[in-house]
C-alpha cells in the first residue's frame, strides 16, 4: 500500500511540474492558465495527497486522470486567449491563414461561427449606464471618448436584447439616440467573432440619405477607434470604382444608401457578404417613402438570411414598414416603442410656434428674422431645390451669408456643406427635406419651416434637428398663410404642441421695392426666381393635404411678390400633372435622398425638387 501512495505522489509531482509552473512555462507548453484552472489543479493535488493507505494504485491513477481531463475541459475566455496564446497555436493559425486565398471569392472565404455560438454579454436588471452592459473595453473606450455615460431610453431598452441576438423593430422619435443603439451591438458582435478583412462584410447599415449615412459612418469611426475591424461607406454620387476596391479588400462594417448598395451587391464580384451576421435598416419609413421599396426587397432577397440578426428602426409605423419587417425580420421579433406613452410626439426641450403671414410678406419676415438672429445657428426648410437655390443666391447677394443643401448638388458639395455647418457655431443653412431625417447637427437654435411640410411626420422630423440629446433645448417657427391654419388641427391630432408667435409689423424690414428692382435688373437672379416660383407652385399642387394646402386658393400676385416680382411671371407649368403623387415622390426621392441604381432613369420636363 505505501507503494500506491508513493506512486500517487510521484504522478502528482510530475503533473504539477508539467502544469503548475509559472505563467510563462504554462504559455510555453501551450496552456493558458486562469484562476479557474488553478483552482482545479489545487483540488487535484489535495485529493491525491490525501489518499489513505487503504486506496490502491489503480484508484490513485484514476483520480489523477479524471482531474487532468477536467483541466483540459476548462474553457478559455477570448481575453485570456489573446494574452497567453501559445506559439504553437499562433503558428497553427498562420498556417490556416496561408491556406485561405485572399482573392475575396465567395467560395474561398472562411466561414464564421453563428452569432448564437458566441456568448454575448447579457445585462441583469435595467442598466442605466454603458459601463453596466458588460461591453468590451475597446467599445467602452470609444463611448467614453465620445463623451457618453448614461443611456437614453431607446438605448436602455434595445441594446441588451440586441446584444443577446434578438431581432428588434424599434420606434423612437428623432434625436433619441438610435444610432448608438444599433451600432454598439453590431460592433460588439464583430469583435466577439473576431472579424478580419478576409471574412468580408459582417454588418450592413442601410440609410435613406447620403448625409445620414456619412453621419453614421462618423459615429462608427469613433466607436471603432480601438477595434481592429474595418469599416466603410458606399453612397450615390461617390466614386464607385474606389468603393469597389475597398469592398474587395474587405469591409467588416458597411454603411450604405439603398441604390448604391444594390448596385455593388449585383455588380461587384469581389464584394464578400456571405458572412453577413447583422442587417440594420435605419429610418425605414423614409427609405420606403422616397421610393426604395423595390430596392430594399431585392437587397433582402440577395443577402444571406441564415442566422442573420436584423435591426429595423422607424420613427413611424406604416403599412409598408410592417411589410418590410415581415420579410426581413426573423419570426418573433421584439417590438420596442418608447414614445407611445408620452404626451407629446416631439422632444420636451423644444419650444414650437407658428406665425400667420400673408404670402407677399413671407420673404420680408424671413429676412427680418435672420437679420435679428445673426449670432444664432438656424436651419430654414424649403419645399424644392429650386427654391433653395434662389433664396441662397439672393441672400448671399445682399450680404446675408447662408449655406445651402439640396438634392441637385454634387455629392462633394453636399458633404462639404454639411460638415461646414456642423462645425459652425453660428450661421444659416437653407435646405430641402434632404436634411430633415436623422442628421445630428450640433447646437441648432432655430428651425424655420418657411414652406409647409408635406404632413405631420415631416414636421416632426424637421423640428427634430434641434433640441437633440438628453437635455437639448431649441425652438422652431413655422410660416403659415391665413388659408393654411387648418394644418394646426392635424398637428394637434399628432400630439404636437404649438403656440402662435407674434412678430410686430413695425419690426419687419420692408425691402420689397429694392427686391423687385434687383430681380428685374439682374438676369441670373431673375431666372433663378422664376425657377423657384414655378417649383413652389408645383410642390404646393402636389401636397398630400390638399384640403388645407389648396393651390387654387393661393393669391398668385402675392406669391410672386415674395419671389421679387411686381406681377406674376409667365411660366410653363402644369398643375395636377399626369404623374401620380406616389410616382412623383419616388422620382423626387431618388434625386434628393439617395443613389439611383443603373437602368432607372426618369424623364420629366421640369425638375421641381
Curated annotation (Swiss-Prot):
This is ATP-dependent RNA helicase has1. It is found in: Nucleus, Nucleolus. Residues 159-335 form the Helicase ATP-binding domain. The Q motif is unique to and characteristic of the DEAD box family of RNA helicases and controls ATP binding and hydrolysis. PROSITE patterns: DEAD_ATP_HELICASE (PS00039), HELICASE_ATP_BIND_1 (PS51192), HELICASE_CTER (PS51194), Q_MOTIF (PS51195). It is an enzyme of class 3 (hydrolase). Pfam families: CTE_SPB4, DEAD, Helicase_C. Associates in the nucleolus with the 60S and pre-60S ribosomal subunits. Residues 1-131, 576-609 are annotated as: Disordered. The lineage of its organism: Eukaryota, Fungi, Dikarya, Ascomycota, Pezizomycotina. Its main location: nucleus. Belongs to the DEAD box helicase family. DDX18/HAS1 subfamily. It catalyses: ATP + H2O = ADP + phosphate + H(+). ATP-dependent RNA helicase involved in 40S ribosomal subunit biogenesis. Required for the processing and cleavage of 35S pre-rRNA at sites A0, A1, and A2, leading to mature 18S rRNA. GO terms for molecular function: ATP binding; ATP hydrolysis activity; identical protein binding; RNA binding; RNA helicase activity. Residues 349-519 form the Helicase C-terminal domain. It comes from Emericella nidulans (strain FGSC A4 / ATCC 38163 / CBS 112.46 / NRRL 194 / M139). Signal peptide: none annotated. GO terms for cellular component: nuclear envelope; nucleolus; preribosome, large subunit precursor; small-subunit processome. A motif (Bipartite nuclear localization signal) lies at residues 361-377. SMART domains: DEXDc, DUF4217, HELICc.
Amino acid at each position: 500500500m505505501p507503494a500506491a501512495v508513493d506512486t500517487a505522489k510521484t504522478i502528482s509531482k510530475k503533473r504539477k511540474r508539467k502544469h503548475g509552473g509559472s505563467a510563462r512555462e504554462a504559455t510555453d507548453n501551450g496552456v493558458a492558465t486562469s484562476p479557474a484552472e488553478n483552482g482545479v489543479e489545487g483540488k487535484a493535488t489535495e485529493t491525491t495527497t490525501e489518499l489513505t493507505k487503504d486506496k490502491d494504485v489503480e484508484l490513485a491513477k484514476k483520480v489523477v486522470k479524471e482531474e487532468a481531463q477536467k483541466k483540459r475541459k476548462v474553457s478559455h475566455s477570448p481575453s485570456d486567449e489573446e494574452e497567453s496564446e501559445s506559439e504553437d497555436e499562433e503558428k497553427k493559425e498562420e498556417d490556416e491563414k496561408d491556406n485561405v486565398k485572399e482573392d475575396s471569392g465567395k467560395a474561398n472565404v472562411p466561414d464564421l461561427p453563428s452569432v448564437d455560438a458566441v456568448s454575448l454579454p447579457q445585462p441583469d436588471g435595467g442598466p442605466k449606464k454603458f459601463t453596466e452592459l458588460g461591453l468590451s473595453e475597446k467599445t467602452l473606450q470609444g463611448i467614453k471618448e465620445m463623451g457618453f455615460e448614461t443611456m437614453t431610453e431607446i438605448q436602455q431598452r434595445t441594446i441588451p436584447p440586441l446584444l443577446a441576438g434578438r431581432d428588434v423593430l424599434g420606434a423612437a422619435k428623432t434625436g433619441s439616440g438610435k444610432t448608438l443603439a444599433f451600432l454598439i451591438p453590431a460592433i460588439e458582435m464583430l469583435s466577439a467573432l473576431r472579424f478580419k478583412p478576409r471574412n468580408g462584410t459582417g454588418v450592413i447599415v442601410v440609410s435613406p440619405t447620403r448625409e445620414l449615412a456619412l453621419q453614421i459612418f462618423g459615429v462608427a469611426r469613433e466607436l471603432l477607434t480601438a477595434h481592429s475591424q474595418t469599416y466603410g461607406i458606399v453612397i450615390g454620387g461617390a466614386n464607385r470604382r474606389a468603393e469597389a476596391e475597398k469592398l474587395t479588400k474587405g469591409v467588416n462594417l458597411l454603411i450604405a444608401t439603398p441604390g448604391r448598395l444594390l448596385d455593388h451587391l449585383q455588380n461587384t464580384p469581389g464584394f464578400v457578404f456571405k458572412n453577413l451576421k447583422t442587417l440594420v435598416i435605419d429610418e425605414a419609413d423614409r427609405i420606403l417613402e422616397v421610393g426604395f421599396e423595390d430596392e430594399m426587397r431585392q437587397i433582402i432577397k440577395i443577402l444571406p438570411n441564415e442566422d442573420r440578426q436584423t435591426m429595423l428602426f422607424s420613427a413611424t409605423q406604416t403599412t409598408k414598414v410592417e411589410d418590410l419587417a415581415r420579410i426581413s425580420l426573423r419570426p418573433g421579433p421584439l417590438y420596442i416603442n418608447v414614445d407611445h406613452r408620452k404626451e407629446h410626439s416631439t422632444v420636451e426641450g423644444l419650444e414650437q410656434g407658428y406665425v400667420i403671414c400673408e404670402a407677399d410678406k413671407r420673404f420680408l419676415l424671413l429676412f427680418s428674422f435672420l437679420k435679428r438672429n445673426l449670432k444664432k445657428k438656424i436651419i430654414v426648410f424649403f419645399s424644392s431645390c429650386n427654391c433653395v437655390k434662389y433664396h441662397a443666391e439672393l441672400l448671399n447677394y445682399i450680404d446675408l451669408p447662408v449655406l445651402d443643401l439640396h438634392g441637385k448638388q454634387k455629392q462633394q458639395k453636399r458633404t462639404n456643406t454639411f460638415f461646414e455647418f456642423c462645425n459652425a457655431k453660428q450661421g444659416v443653412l437653407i435646405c430641402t427635406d434632404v436634411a430633415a431625417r436623422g442628421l445630428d447637427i450640433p447646437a441648432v437654435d432655430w428651425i424655420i419651416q418657411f414652406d409647409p411640410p408635406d404632413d405631420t411626420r415631416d414636421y416632426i422630423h424637421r423640428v427634430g434637428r434641434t433640441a437633440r440629446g438628453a437635455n437639448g433645448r431649441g425652438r422652431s417657427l413655422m410660416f403659415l398663410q391665413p388659408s393654411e391654419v387648418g394644418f394646426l388641427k392635424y398637428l394637434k391630432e399628432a400630439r404636437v404642441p404649438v403656440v402662435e408667435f407674434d412678430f410686430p409689423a413695425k419690426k419687419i424690414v420692408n425691402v420689397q421695392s429694392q427686391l423687385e428692382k434687383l430681380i428685374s435688373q439682374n438676369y441670373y437672379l431673375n431666372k433663378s426666381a422664376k425657377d423657384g416660383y414655378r417649383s413652389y407652385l408645383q410642390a404646393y399642387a402636389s401636397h398630400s393635404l390638399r384640403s388645407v394646402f389648396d393651390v387654387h386658393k393661393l393669391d398668385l400676385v402675392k406669391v410672386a411678390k415674395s419671389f421679387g416680382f411686381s406681377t406674376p411671371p409667365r411660366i410653363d407649368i402644369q398643375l395636377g400633372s399626369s404623374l401620380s403623387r406616389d410616382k412623383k415622390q419616388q422620382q423626387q426621392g431618388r434625386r434628393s435622398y439617395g443613389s439611383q441604381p443603373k437602368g432607372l432613369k426618369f424623364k420629366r420636363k421640369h425638375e421641381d425638387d
